[in-house]
Regions:
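Acidic, low-complexity, intrinsically disordered peripheral segments
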Residues: 6-22, 26-68, 236, 251-260, ...
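Amphipathic alpha-helical coiled-coil scaffold segments and their short linker/junction regions
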Residues: 24-27, 47-98, 213, 238-299, ...
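C-terminal structural cap/anchor segments
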Residues: 342-381, 388, 392
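A glycine-/polar-enriched beta->alpha junction
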Residues: 46, 68-148, 161-165, 169, ...
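Outer-membrane beta-barrel pore domains and translocons
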Residues: 100-108, 131-133, 198, 300-304, ...
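Charged, solvent-exposed structural "stalk/scaffold" segments
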Residues: 37, 145, 149-231, 370-441
Length: 451
């Protein structure tokens, strides 16, 4: 009943992916320790001879379905907004109707009977006028006015798009780290199995006074560090009884010409700056002296209710104009030229900072390329060394140092661990470059070549 109760309590619980093993052993037997070594050597020989070769995890930098949906919806809304605003401008033909009605109270109280004066006086006046405000219409600078609408919406669209794509870099870095962590974690798990057996052996030797505390403490510390790393890297993944995964070493070649061209012309930041400059140039065209005047041809019809209770009518045509006695437009254009210089200087500063940070990352990638190649060569040579030593150990009639042999296998695993971490750091450096220069989809700037 107790066993059934215990099973019922544990049923349905998710098993832990990793549990620390025993650190301190008691009552160790020499035969048991040697048997553990031999079993582990046989297991390692099989794993090393038959690894699972995998390609280096790919940096899947790109927009997911939700990104595409959000961007497409935003683009569609801005295009619709621009179209409606252009239609509104096209309706602005400059025609305007004005009218006025007013009375003259003095006409009711004046007793003068002069007929001539009676004709010139009126009690009320009604006036209607059709004018054509041509300068403030689509017919004057219509192209520039439509461009102003389009550029303002394009600037807003690009700025929103930049915010919509800002999260893909962290997401991509997390996904890449997760992939590498699995491979790194499995290597550390195999190293930990070696350290467990070495720890067991050192404690047996300590009991027999054959070793100092220093070596045992080092192995115990290495074991604790490995357990900590696994708990961080693979806390929610099962890495027990996994094969040895061999990631094919690669070298990353960066097309710096295409990279800097993207920074200068194709990135979202560059397009935003170019749009701001186009807005300033277009605004400079709109700012001229004529645009501050009003020139309105008109036709007017007037009806008078005269003091003698008769009605008279008359029509006239003319041109009404308003001309300012000052001209502020040269100063406005000068201000716009200054604004363009501010935009260019700001962009120049941004590009300078981007180039500095990117050059540091490019140097880091090159250094990591060299370190990865060195580790790959070291792994290759260590593997050959282990193969040669395997036959030597088998033919050793007087026995051999089991701990030394285990350290050789552990050294190979540690070299794999270092190389995988170097490749991860290189991938993260690439993502940081892509973030700095606003690359948000897969491109041909970074090419990965197998060594």
């Amino acid at each position: 009943m107790a066993a059934q109760s215990s099973m019922a309590q544990t049923k349905g619980k998710k098993p832990k992916s990793f549990s620390p093993k025993m650190l301190v052993y008691e009552n160790l037997q020499n035969d048991n320790v040697l048997r553990h070594f031999k079993q582990r050597f046989a297991q390692l020989d099989t794993l090393i001879k038959n690894p699972i070769w995998v390609k280096a995890p790919v940096i899947e930098l790109g927009l997911n379905k939700q990104h595409h949906a959000d961007i497409n919806k935003t683009d569609s809304l801005f295009w619709s907004k621009t179209a409606h605003e252009h239609l509104a401008l096209n309706r602005h033909n400059g025609l305007e109707v004005t009218g006025q009605v007013y009375a003259r109270p003095d006409a009711y109280f004046d007793s003068d009977e002069d007929d001539a004066k009676e004709v010139s006086k009126y009690k009320m006046k009604v006036q209607a006028e059709l004018g054509w405000n041509i300068i403030n219409s689509k017919f004057y600078q219509g192209k520039e006015k439509r461009t102003k609408i389009a550029l303002a919406n394009e600037l807003d669209r690009l700025q929103i798009k930049k915010r919509q794509t800002a999260d893909i870099y962290e997401k991509t870095a997390d996904e890449l780290t997760e992939q590498y962590n699995f491979y790194i974690g499995t290597v550390i798990a195999h190293k930990l199995d070696n350290l467990d057996i070495m720890n067991e052996a050192y404690q047996y030797m300590l009991e027999k006074d054959r070793i100092s505390n220093d070596k045992m403490l080092k192995v115990m510390n290495d074991k604790l560090e490995a357990e900590y790393d696994i708990s961080i890297l693979c806390s929610d993944r099962d890495i027990t009884n996994k094969p040895i995964y061999r990631i094919k070493p690669t070298r990353v070649v960066v097309d710096t010409t295409a990279l800097w061209e993207h920074v200068d012309k194709e990135s979202l930041d560059a397009r935003i700056v170019m749009t701001k400059l186009e807005i300033a140039n277009n605004e400079s065209k709109l700012n001229n002296y004529l645009s501050t005047t009003r020139l309105t041809p008109f036709a007017r019809w007037s009806t008078y209710w005269q003091s003698n209770d008769k009605f008279s009518h008359n029509g006239d045509v003319g041109i009404r104009f308003t001309v300012p006695i000052y001209n502020e437009n040269p100063r406005k254009r000068k201000a716009l030229e200054t604004q363009k210089e501010i935009i260019m200087n700001s962009r120049s500063t941004d590009v300078k900072e981007i180039r500095q940070s990117v050059n540091i990352l490019l140097k880091k990638i090159e250094n990591l390329n060299q370190a990865i190649a060195t580790e790959a060569y070291h792994i290759q040579q260590t593997g050959k060394y282990i193969d040669m030593r395997r036959f030597a150990y088998k033919n050793q009639k007087k026995g051999y140092n089991y701990l030394m042999r285990m350290e050789e296998y552990t050294g190979l695993l540690e070299s794999m661990e270092r190389m995988y971490k170097l490749m991860l750091n290189r991938g993260l450096a690439i993502i940081n470059i892509e973030k700095a220069v606003s690359i948000y989809n897969n491109n041909n700037i970074f090419n990965e070549i197998e060594l």
